[in-house]
Design a protein with these regions (language model features):
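Extended hydrophobic alpha-helices typical of membrane-associated regions
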Residues: 128-131, 231-271
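Transmembrane alpha-helical segments that form the membrane-embedded catalytic/substrate-channel core
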Residues: 47-58, 116-127, 148-152, 170-189, ...
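Hydrophobic, membrane-inserted alpha-helices
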Residues: 90-98, 215-223, 239-244, 261-265
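Small-residue-rich segments of transmembrane alpha-helices in multi-pass membrane proteins
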Residues: 11-19, 75-78, 137-155, 199-208, ...
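Topogenic membrane-insertion module of multi-pass membrane proteins
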Residues: 1-58, 132-133, 142-145, 153
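Intramembrane alpha-helical segments
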Residues: 83-158
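Helix-coil boundary and interhelical linker segments in multi-pass alpha-helical membrane proteins
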Residues: 18-42, 94-109, 148-170, 221-230, ...
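Solvent-exposed interhelical
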Residues: 54-93, 173-223
Length: 271
């Protein structure tokens, strides 16, 4: 579980989602009892969603992982298919329970696009062979789920349908694009030593992947300001971009700085 779903890191990402949503769409004062309740529920929904995605990916990518990553938990028998299925069912139940708790019945309807997109993702948009040959298209399609996810968060928190709210949805989406590129930035290698073409640095090249991280950070910060966040978020984003550029030769530095930029920008949006 820890190997494929590191709970501390995933929990930090879930907290970042909740903080960002409250910063851009919330109406209650930060630190109030209702604010904390919403924070916990939003984080819980996102955590459960990520767990459901993890379970889906283990099933969806089983053949690929068995070929190039034979020591992963499912491949080496450390976890059974039955246990994986039970985890997925539990994650879905927790996710839907959190959605209803934070947004009620109407919110469940608003969350439906997230469920539909994630279900289509599980079958690779019914175009597995096509997407296997088009890495960037696959990336874009998979990241689309953040648009309805942040749209649901805005609805759940009572944000009006304005240009500022739409800017907030885009800001959140781009910030979590950073998280995704960072997650699969470092090159991976098959048992025979060959580089596996399933990471962003391997397919796009390190420079292009870093450019995507930096531009997404800056665009997210600017959109957050358009959504009502303070200008301090642009300062924080610029600082991370400069640091990433300065340490761009180190995979570890890019991953650590890129990963830390997500909760840092989310927190800065509260100001």
């Amino acid at each position: 579980m820890q190997e494929r779903f590191p709970l501390p890191l995933v929990s930090l990402l879930a907290a970042s989602f909740a903080v960002l949503s409250l910063a851009l769409f919330g109406a209650d004062p930060a630190g109030s009892p209702r604010w904390w309740a919403q924070l916990v529920l939003l984080a819980l929904v996102f955590l459960a969603l990520l767990l459901r995605y993890r379970v889906t990916d283990e099933w969806k990518d089983f053949a690929h992982d068995s070929s190039v990553y034979p020591r992963r938990p499912l491949q080496r028998g450390a976890i059974s298919v039955r246990t994986l299925m039970l985890l997925g069912i539990a994650a879905l139940a927790l996710e839907l329970g959190g959605v209803v708790a934070v947004s009620g019945g109407p919110g469940l309807l608003a969350y439906l696009p997230v469920l539909v997109l994630s279900a289509i993702t599980a079958v690779e948009f019914f175009a597995r062979r096509v997407l296997a040959r088009r890495f960037t298209l696959s990336f874009v399609l998979h990241e689309l789920v953040y648009l309805p996810l942040f749209g649901w968060a805005a609805f759940a928190l009572g944000a009006p349908l304005t240009a500022g709210t739409l800017a907030g949805v885009a800001a959140g989406t781009l910030l979590f694009v950073v998280a995704e590129v960072v997650r699969k930035f470092e090159p991976r290698f098959a048992p025979d030593g060959a580089m596996v073409a399933d990471t962003y640095s391997a397919v796009w090249g390190r420079t292009a992947a870093i450019v995507v991280i930096v531009l997404s950070l800056l665009a997210s910060a600017l959109l957050a300001v358009a959504a009502g966040a303070g200008v301090v978020v642009t300062v924080v984003a610029a600082a991370f971009c400069v640091a990433i550029a300065a340490l761009r030769r180190s995979d570890r530095a890019v991953m650590v700085l890129g990963g830390l930029s997500v909760p840092a920008l989310a927190a800065a949006m509260l100001s």
